[in-house]
Structure formats: C-alpha cells, structure tokens
C-alpha cells in the first residue's frame, strides 16, 4: 500500500471559495488541518518542505502550527488583513520544478533542493547519527567579529560570508555575485525580464513582491510624517522621507565618500565606480547602468512618446522634456538662481546655470580630460570620440549623435515651428532658438568670458569662444585627421570626403554642400547685385565679396604668414599659401589617388579622367579643361603674345 502524504488528505479551497467562508468556518478549517498534520506525524510521516525557512525554527514556532498557518495564509491574504483582490498572481515556479538548489553544503559546496536533504548530507561529513546531528545543529554559535549569537550552525556559517566576502552565487550573464541565494534569484529576473507578481486590478506586473505590495490599490497610507503631514503606503518609504527632514545619509561610498539617504541611490552610485551595466538592449546591444536609462533608450527603437502635451499635442520620449515643454505655454519660470536672480523654466536648467558661478565640473572625459558640469554632457561629449550616432530619422534614415540634432533635422521634413516670439511674431522650431532670439530684443548677454570680457547671448557660443583661448579642437576627422573647434565646421568638412550635396537649386538643379553656397548661387539667376563699391561702382552678389574688393582700394592685408611675412587680403588665400610651407595636400582624386593643395586643382584634374571641357571658345569652338587655359587661348585671337 502506498504511503499517505499530507496533500492526499488535505482539503483545498480556491481563493473565491475561501472568500465565501465566515470566520468560524475558517477557524474550523485550521483546526482540522492541524489535527490531520498531527496524525500523519504520529504515523511517522516526515515532512520535507523546501519553503520552511530556518528563521521560523529559530523563532521557536511549532512546525505543525506554522505549516497550517502558512496554508491558510495562502488563501486569506497577508497577516495585515489583505483582501484577496490585493493578492498577486504568482507566476514563478518552485525550485523543485526549475532545478534550482539554494541549499549549499559549507564543507564540500554541494547544492540541494531541500534543506532536509542538506541536513542528511551533512552527517556524511560529521559522522553523527540523526539525533546527534540535530543536537549539533542546535548548539549556539557566536561570531567573533561582531559578537552576534546564532542558534544553528548553518545560520552562523551563512553569516560568516558577510565578513569573509565569499559570494558563492554568481550570475552567468553579467558575473555579479551574491552572498545569499534569494537575492541572486531575484537578480536573475532582471535579465530574464520575469515579473511574477501581477496586480489583478490593473494588470501591472512586478519583479519583487515588495514592489507589488507598495503598488496596492487600497488607498491606505498608514505612515504619516509628523513634520509635514505627508503619508506613505510602506514603512521603508516613510523612513526614507524622514531623512529629508533630518538630513541623515547613512549610506556612504567607500571610494569617494559621497553619502546617500536611500540604499537604492547608493547602489546605483556604486556603478559609476565599478562600470557595471546590467541592463542590455536586445536590439542594438548597448548596455546601461540604470534601469530608467535602459527604459528611456528602448523608446528610441520603438518610437514611443508616452508624454503628450494637451495644449498643442506634441509628444515626448521623456517626462523631464514634457514638463519643461508645458511651462513654455504658461510662460512661467519658477526656478531662480540665488546668485544672480536669473529665472528658469526647469529646476535642471537652474542647477546647470548655478555651476557657472561655482565652476564645478565633476564629470571628466577619460580620453581627453575635458570636464563637464553634468553626466549627460559627458556622455554626449564621448560620442565625438566614438562616432556613435544612435538617433535615426525614420523618413530619410540619416543618423545623429544627439536627440536634439535629430529633432532639428526632423523639422526639415515637417516644417513645424511651434515657438513664436511675442514681440515680433517670428517662429522657431526649438525653444532654445526662441530664447536666443528673444535676447536680440533685450540685448541680454549673460555669458561673459573671464579672460577677455567678451559677452555672449548663448551658452553654446560662449563655450565655442572659450576654445579660442584654450586651443581646444574636440572634433577630429577620422579620414584626414583635421581637427575643428565647432561641430558644425566638422560636419561641413566631412562632406568634402563624402561628396554629399544636400542643397539643390530649384531653378537649374545644381547641388551644393552648404546652404550658404546655395543662397549665393541663387543670386546668379536673379541677376541682383545689391552690394556696390562706393569708390568704383562695381557691384557684387555677396557682402563678403565687397569687403574683399574694398581692400584692393585700401591696400589692407590683414592675414600675414608667420613664416615668410607675406600678407593676404582674404583668409582663404592665406590658408592656401600656408600649404606651400606645410606641404599639406588635403584634396585627393578618387580615381587615381593623386593629392592636391587646393579643391579647385582637384576639380580641374578630375576632368582629365571624365573628359569634361566646360570652357569653349566662341570664335573657333575649341574647348578647355580650365578657365586659365581658356583665357590664354583667347589672347591668340586678339593678337596678344602669350
């Protein structure tokens, strides 16, 4: 005859059935289950349950009462009167089915599913009989390091790991190790994306039971702060809040000494030292130190913009961007700098500004040593070294290093300009552009250079100006090694290698690398030459051309070569001259590889491959590769000696 187990004789209720029982019926159920369990124990039935934790025995609980109590609690909710509607749907399997073995032998390292199995195995090391081993386990142990006393040897051995630093449970995915099995098991869920605790009311899922408990829809907030009256659902949140009044920061980083009021902030901070990035994107492989950063990054792939403005319908990836945008409609600037009184529409902008007064720049680039006031500024700067461009335009698939650059580019497709100047009515694609424009009305220049006293309307112009003093050129071309002060100059230079000409003339179809070149070209079609020389009456298409021309009258040559003393009217001719000293030949023929000092020279040379001869003599029809050869030929018709 097969042995009888507790499951064979136990009566099980569903949660719905349990909710229908009154208190007397539930009490009767507990009494019957206790009696059943007692009878099985008297018959010699051994109860081996992996969920009976050692700490229950340490507290002196009667095993029979504990088993029935736990069985009943699984139906009626928590000890605090939790209703069945607040109980989670637990979707995680027990160790028996997953093959997990959380109980480890401290002698040989062998793992076991059940603690009772570990107990039996331990006797093979100690040589003790069952009753003797039970007595051995119950002998009190005292930790020499902190003086803490333990009722059981295995509890003492676990505690010892906190002093020795032994972490036997290591994550196979990221290598992180843990002292105890339970935290290790919870950590594994962050990789698997497993969220076993589901709220029945709203369907939201959680990795940890504590998070689920905090989420409960009861509306009860039993923990109230006596100082400010704020109430909290859970005791831990209440304790953390109290520290905002006391200023207590009990969690201190051993590496840098920075202290935190919350253990989660402390653990997050530690990753800045260890470089740990446990959250990895499955689409692009990029890893993140923080779960919040990982979730925000996923939106760049999905295109999700969960924060929508009710005023204008504009949607945002991030809540911070949304909050900053909402203030634009109200015009409010509630955050004021204590030093200079300047007001800002976001607390973040105010904090960044305050650092301009104290000069604090705690974030340093490991490659070039440049320091930044904010970690996000450092991360954005690092992309200038790596060339990373994570933001892609869905319409033309062009990629960008910065989300702001992508948004700016997207307006070229939509033409959207939602930010309007209240004084002159001019509209802009971005709030930052509007702010810069507004300063043209009030002449405000809040950014002043400490070295030369020059002031600027915009912080970006100010930072670029500072480089003229430091000589810093952070943007380097990977193809030719040329470096630039401005990112815009660097991007324009890249087109000399790629041949990209995104600006097209609508009248003749000619394309240009730069928007300024297109604007100048368009004047050729209109014939309009608005800039006239006052001395000789000669007219020009561009203001830059007339300035250069005027120097032929004044004799001014502001650009002088330091090596040979020769002076030039224009900066372009001066730079070309410098190449005669340096030997630099930045322009290379794509077909034969021959290098040239000047872009005009490489264009003329390329015609020797294509056969193009754009300069044709009207008198004899002979064509030429270059304008200089054509002008020499024309003299033969005029009778000039060449």
Swiss-Prot record:
Gene3D superfamilies: 6.10.140.140, Classic Zinc Finger
GO CC terms of this entry: nucleus
Record-annotated KRAB domain positions: 4-76
Record-linked InterPro entries: C2H2-ZF_domain-containing (IPR050636), KRAB (IPR001909), KRAB_dom_sf (IPR036051), Znf_C2H2_sf (IPR036236), Znf_C2H2_type (IPR013087)
Stated name of the protein: Zinc finger protein 14
Chain's gene name: ZNF14
Pfam families, alphabetized: KRAB (PF01352), zf-C2H2 (PF00096), zf-C2H2_6 (PF13912)
Keywords: DNA-binding, Metal-binding, Nucleus, Repeat, Transcription, Transcription regulation, Zinc, Zinc-finger
Chief location of this protein within or outside the cell: nucleus
Family: Belongs to the krueppel C2H2-type zinc-finger protein family.
GO biological-process terms attached to the record: regulation of transcription by RNA polymerase II
UniProt source species: Homo sapiens (Human)
Cell compartment(s), UniProt: Nucleus
Superkingdom field: Eukaryota
Function summary: May be involved in transcriptional regulation.
Zn finger (C2H2-type) start-end: 103-125, 141-163, 169-191, 197-217, 223-245, 251-273, 279-301, 307-329, 335-357, 363-385, 391-413, 419-441, 447-469, 475-497, 503-525, 531-553, 559-581, 587-609, 615-637
Keyword Transcription regulation set for record: yes
Gene Ontology molecular function, alphabetical: DNA-binding transcription factor activity, RNA polymerase II-specific; RNA polymerase II transcription regulatory region sequence-specific DNA binding; zinc ion binding
UniProt cross-references to PANTHER family, sorted A to Z: RB-ASSOCIATED KRAB ZINC FINGER-RELATED, ZINC FINGER PROTEIN 200
